Amino acid sequence: MTNQNVIVSDRKPILGLKTITVSVSNSPLFSNSFPTYFNFPRRKLLKLLEAADKNNLVVAPKITSMIDSMRDSSPTRLRSSSYDSVSDNDDKTSWIVRFPSALNMFDEIVNAAKGKQIVMFLDYDGTLSPIVEDPDKAFITHEMREVVKDVASNFPTAIVTGRSIEKVRSFVQVNEIYYAGSHGMDIEGPTNENSNGQSNERVLFQPAREFLPMIEKVVNILEEKTKWIPGAMVENNKFCLSVHFRRVDEKRWPALAEVVKSVLIDYPKLKLTQGRKVLEIRPTIKWDKGQALNFLLKSLGYENSDDVVPVYIGDDRTDEDAFKVLRERGQGFGILVSKVPKDTNASYSLQDPSQVNKFLERLVEWKRKTVGEE
């Protein structure tokens, strides 16, 4: 039986997926036993939080854990002592040995792909575009857009992002690729224009359609409850939502964390994850960027193929799900974009979007050269 949440434009099932079971999160973060501060007026809540900060009072453990996690998603702070600086350099050197630059190891990567089909998977924020203060201004450069077009003309290519498809497509402006938005919960194939000049999507996959009304409601609630926290921004990503705190003063993080926690208590079918300076809220279905990668490979006919080399490039915690899938498949390469050492399931690293651009350029050049030699 075809899952009712899987939609194909020609009304035919692609994969015959089984019905996806929605589970309830058991995370203690969402425990109903934890008291909410919202019995208090907002001013009183702020005074309590400010008093706790000034007097070094202990914030409730579950919120403290959440704040620590929010700090972990921040860029690594510079340390003052020369000893720590030397230690950091040693750690980075050791990390680079374990996860060498994909540029330095380029020949090793393409040698493994000889005679096989490379399939490219690309995150957006922090990978194709730089991380910026305002998420609405995370524009891709002209050079990056052109190289993505070149990559798409040589390899099956997908952008896998937490953003909505509409938002990321407006940034990228490339039709010849797959878009997997909302952490893979919204997948569309390359578009083409019909005789009337209208675009047609080949594939549309939405395993969380039933959550749309719930997501919309939570977006509205959080927009209302966070508007008094300067710098907080709620973004509707269609099948998930983001609460950005990049521009929020760190002293306000406990208040923001409490707002998010208090809202999610009433929505146990939603779970909280984190990215770089962003809280991600999404359905508790078993679906992530790794599942999206597998879905796309299966759609392309490479589910059980030994002649495919998936390459996934991303910078975020949520990309680790895709890196892990590649490890489990025993094929392909995960490339982490990061300037600082991080725990990762990737095989290689790149420092920033400019290095991603260089890697993609070299990949296109290699492909054109090998085609010319055939």
From Swiss-Prot:
Keywords: Hydrolase, Stress response. Induction: By trehalose. InterPro entries: HAD-like_sf, HAD-SF_hydro_IIB, HAD_sf, OTSB-like, Trehalose_PPase. Removes the phosphate from trehalose 6-phosphate to produce free trehalose. Trehalose accumulation in plant may improve abiotic stress tolerance. It holds the Pfam family Trehalose_PPase. One of its GO terms (molecular function) is trehalose-phosphatase activity. Its cofactor is a divalent metal cation. It comes from the Eukaryota. The keyword Hydrolase applies. Pathway: Glycan biosynthesis; trehalose biosynthesis. The lineage of its organism: Eukaryota, Viridiplantae, Streptophyta, Embryophyta, Tracheophyta. It catalyses: alpha,alpha-trehalose 6-phosphate + H2O = alpha,alpha-trehalose + phosphate. This is Trehalose-phosphate phosphatase B. Belongs to the trehalose phosphatase family. The keyword Magnesium does not apply. Expressed in flowers. It is an enzyme of class 3 (hydrolase). Its EC number is 3.1.3.12. One of its GO terms (biological process) is trehalose biosynthetic process.
